């Protein structure tokens, strides 16, 4: 005999599909209920949604077969009710079967056989949290109903959607209830039982509207049409039940509720089910829809759909529980065990120090287990700073970029003093090269600072997660290594300064890589020749008339009263020497005629000459000085600079100095590029790596500090206890899933979640007879 051949009141007694699957999920719900709002794993369940007074409560009571829910004209369900229906075995002696309820908030859990008491407990628990004046809360109530007359189903009865606030309800009560409902039904693991009354337009159903928001394709929504017996005359719900109005993948089921008069008359649900069957048989319009009509068919459909829904979700459910178990176990491990003995605390502190130092050393050496593959880290960053930042920056510097030709010529002239130099002096070269060497100090010190900053970053990265439970120890370790790194930075910077000063103190021109003077002169001459520097053009006052200078010779030129350049220094006027004044001019010389022309003019030139030749020398000289006025010198300017033009010899000297500077600077630069990283590695990096463990032992591993360092904050103890409880619950849930038999392969494979499922494969919609093949597999 098939299920369809049974009377409606007996349909619930049929052995349900997945009789071991739903109890497992119910057990998981009980397990995760211990976590309360902390539970992040959504279990398969059926959420009942509908507007206020849509008949939700009547449907649930019909599924249970007993009156147990609060009743009234106003909103009755003010907290979510997690309802687990558990089928028990019928009594073997033919006596009355026991039915009872258990509330999960009771500790210890006790059986309640009086369903009126169950109703009162629901009301009391609702008032305890939501208040007595129609307040609403999202904290669920857990209730189990044990009966041989039910199928294994897990439901969540949600508050009805209301429009107008009453009592203490806020003005936005509708929005709050809708938000609460969506938090449940938005989960893909939740089936939606959308309850809509038949005496209202289905297109305006609040239940279908909110279900459509969470399940727009209708893949996990079951429609329930209530109050079919009070529809207007001449109307029926056949098109609704066939899904022609609003299609749903899981279809619709129509039911007849008890009226308010039936409830007041204490009409039993058993009698109501008989009346419901009689109603459908008396309505020819509903013929051929027996698998879509009545509470027994609804119970069977819910059972079948829920079982297959659970089967489809089991793999992902196991995966989520395992992932949560792994993450929670790792978190609990990070909190560590409670160590109260002094010896145990000392060993724990020593283990922290050792682990930290090993992590620090491994990170520097590139042996860390947590090495990044997306970016450079640890010692690789230090090498990058040495090669790609420090060395590259020094190689890009031109030692002569801030030295002009005038700077070099001025240095050469200053080095010669009052004498003219026959060769390029070495003093200006040393002065200039020292100045360029000193420029290497700042980038070298900056390189050491960069490495220090990298070591500080590494020290922070090596802080183990276990240290979070000891904030005092973590802070002290951070302080110790910070001070220790600074202590290593100081000698490394001092060594860098010494290296630069050593290079400045001794200019080794005998270095085998130094260009040398001979080669420098050759290159300088070639450079000057190729540049074709024109000869300097003398200013007008520096020029002597050709006819007066033709026979004077070089001696007359160098002793001319006219303006000249002495040792490259510009002077403003010519000054005669005593020798010039006393020495007679050679025959044919024009010096004196030039000298007299400056002071006496050209008209008296011949007379003055004859007069001088006819007088004795002493008389002539005395007369000359008597006739000449006193000559006053201009004071030299405060700052003297080289002339704007320079000779070919000066160009060669400048070019030689530049070549010598570049050659020796390259030697020093290479020395600095090699020695500065070595100094930093020796005094800072390797020193801290070698001595860090000893420093921690010296600074922290003290008997009078251990207890203070290993003191846990109060909130950490709370976290450890909560995590331990979560771990226990997840382990229990994992063991519960392991108890699940291989029934997943024994149910119909037609039910799928997603767009691949087809309407014609729905269980309980076309074929309801259960057949078993030779392999023991079930087919619907």
Curated annotation (Swiss-Prot):
Residues 50-57 are annotated as: G1 motif. PROSITE patterns: G_DYNAMIN_1, G_DYNAMIN_2, GED. CDD domains: DLP_1 (cd08771). It is found in: Mitochondrion; Peroxisome. One of its GO terms (biological process) is peroxisome organization. GTP binds at residues 50-57, 157-161, 226-229. Residues 226-229 are annotated as: G4 motif. Residues 157-160 are annotated as: G3 motif. Coiled coil: none annotated. Residues 536-558, 573-592, 753-780 are annotated as: Disordered. Residues 40-315 form the Dynamin-type G domain. The modification N-acetylserine is found at residue 2. Its main location: mitochondrion. InterPro entries: Dynamin, Dynamin_GTPase, Dynamin_GTPase_CS, Dynamin_N, Dynamin_stalk, G_DYNAMIN_dom, GED, GED_dom. Residues 539-548, 753-770 have a biased composition (Basic and acidic residues). Residues 654-745 form the GED domain. Residues 549-558, 771-780 have a biased composition (Polar residues). One of its GO terms (molecular function) is GTPase activity. Residues 76-78 are annotated as: G2 motif. The keyword GTP-binding applies. GO terms for cellular component: mitochondrion; peroxisome. Interacts with ARC5 on peroxisomes and ELM1 on mitochondria. Belongs to the TRAFAC class dynamin-like GTPase superfamily. Dynamin/Fzo/YdjA family. This is Dynamin-related protein 3B. It comes from Arabidopsis thaliana (Mouse-ear cress).
């Amino acid at each position: 005999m098939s299920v369809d051949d049974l009377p409606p009141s007996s349909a619930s007694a049929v052995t349900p599909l997945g009789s071991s699957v739903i109890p497992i999920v119910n057990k998981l719900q009980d397990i995760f209920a211990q976590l309360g709002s902390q539970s992040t794993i959504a279990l398969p369940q059926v959420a009942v949604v509908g507007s206020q007074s849509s008949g939700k409560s009547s449907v649930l009571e019909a599924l249970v077969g007993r009156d147990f829910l609060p009743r009234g004209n106003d909103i009755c369900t003010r907290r979510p009710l997690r309802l687990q229906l558990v089928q028990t075995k019928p009594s073997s002696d033919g006596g009355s079967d026991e039915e009872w309820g258990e509330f999960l908030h009771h500790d210890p859990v006790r059986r309640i056989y009086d369903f009126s008491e169950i109703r009162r407990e629901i009301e009391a628990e609702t008032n305890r949290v939501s208040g007595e004046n129609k307040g609403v809360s999202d904290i669920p109530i857990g209730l189990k109903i044990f009966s041989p007359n039910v199928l294994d189903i897990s439901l969540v009865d949600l508050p009805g959607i209301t429009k107008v606030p009453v009592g203490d309800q806020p003005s936005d009560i509708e929005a709050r209830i809708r938000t609460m409902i969506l938090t449940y039904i938005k989960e893909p693991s939740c089936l939606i039982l959308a309850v809509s009354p038949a005496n209202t337009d289905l297109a305006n159903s609040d239940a279908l509207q909110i279900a459509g928001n969470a399940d727009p394709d209708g893949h996990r929504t079951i429609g329930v049409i209530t109050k079919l017996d009070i529809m207007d005359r001449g109307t029926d719900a056949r098109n609704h039940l066939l899904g022609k109005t609003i299609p749903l993948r899981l279809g619709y089921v129509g039911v007849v509720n008890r009226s308010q008069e039936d409830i007041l008359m204490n009409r039993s649900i058993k009698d109501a089910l008989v009346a419901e069957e009689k109603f459908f048989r008396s309505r020819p319009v509903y013929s051929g829809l027996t698998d879509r009509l009545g509470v027994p068919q609804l119970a069977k459909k819910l059972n079948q759909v829920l079982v297959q829904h659970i089967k489809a979700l089991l793999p992902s459910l196991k995966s989520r529980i395992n992932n949560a178990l792994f993450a929670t176990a790792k978190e609990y491990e990070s909190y560590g065990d409670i160590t109260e003995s002094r010896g145990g605390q000392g060993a724990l502190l020593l283990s922290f120090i050792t682990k930290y130092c090993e992590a620090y050393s491994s990170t520097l050496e590139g042996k860390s287990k947590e090495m990044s593959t997306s970016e450079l880290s640890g010692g690789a960053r230090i090498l990058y700073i040495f090669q790609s930042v420090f060395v590259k920056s020094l190689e890009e510097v031109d030692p002569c970029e801030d030295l002009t030709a005038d700077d070099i010529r001025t240095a050469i002239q200053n080095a010669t003093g009052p004498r003219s130099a026959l060769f390029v002096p070495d003093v200006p070269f040393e002065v200039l090269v020292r100045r360029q060497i000193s420029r290497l100090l700042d980038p070298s010190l900056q390189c050491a600072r960069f490495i220090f900053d990298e070591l500080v970053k590494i020290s922070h990265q090596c802080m183990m997660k276990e240290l979070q439970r000891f904030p005092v120890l973590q802070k002290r370790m951070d302080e110790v290594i910070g001070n220790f790194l600074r202590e290593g930075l100081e000698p490394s910077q001092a060594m860098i300064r010494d290296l630069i000063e050593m290079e400045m103190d001794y200019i080794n021109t005998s270095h085998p890589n130094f260009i040398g003077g001979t080669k420098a002169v050759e290159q300088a001459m070639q450079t000057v020749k190729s540049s074709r520097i024109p000869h300097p053009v003398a200013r007008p006052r520096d020029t002597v008339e050709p006819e007066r200078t033709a026979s004077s010779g070089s001696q007359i030129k160098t002793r001319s009263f006219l303006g000249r350049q002495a040792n490259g220094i510009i002077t403003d006027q010519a000054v005669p020497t005593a020798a010039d004044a006393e020495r007679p001019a050679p025959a044919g010389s024009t010096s004196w005629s030039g000298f007299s022309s400056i002071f006496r003019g050209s008209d008296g030139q011949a007379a003055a000459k004859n007069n001088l030749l006819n007088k004795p020398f002493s008389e002539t000289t005395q007369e000359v000085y008597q006739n000449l006025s006193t000559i006053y010198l201009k004071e030299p300017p405060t700052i003297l600079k080289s002339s704007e033009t320079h000779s070919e010899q000066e160009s060669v000297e400048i070019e030689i100095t530049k070549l010598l500077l570049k050659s020796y600077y390259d030697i020093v630069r290479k020395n600095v590029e090699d020695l500065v990283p070595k100094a930093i590695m020796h005094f800072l990096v390797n020193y801290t790596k070698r001595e860090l463990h000893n420093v921690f032992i010296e600074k922290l591993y003290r008997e009078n500090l251990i207890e203070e360092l290993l003191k846990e904050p109060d909130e950490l103890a709370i976290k450890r206890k909560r995590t331990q409880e979560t771990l226990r619950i997840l382990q229990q849930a994992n063991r519960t899933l392991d108890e699940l038999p291989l029934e997943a392969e024994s149910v119909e494979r037609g039910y799928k979640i997603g767009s691949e499922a087809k309407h014609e494969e729905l269980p309980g919609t076309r074929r309801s007879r259960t057949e078993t093949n030779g392999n023991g597999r079930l087919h619907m």
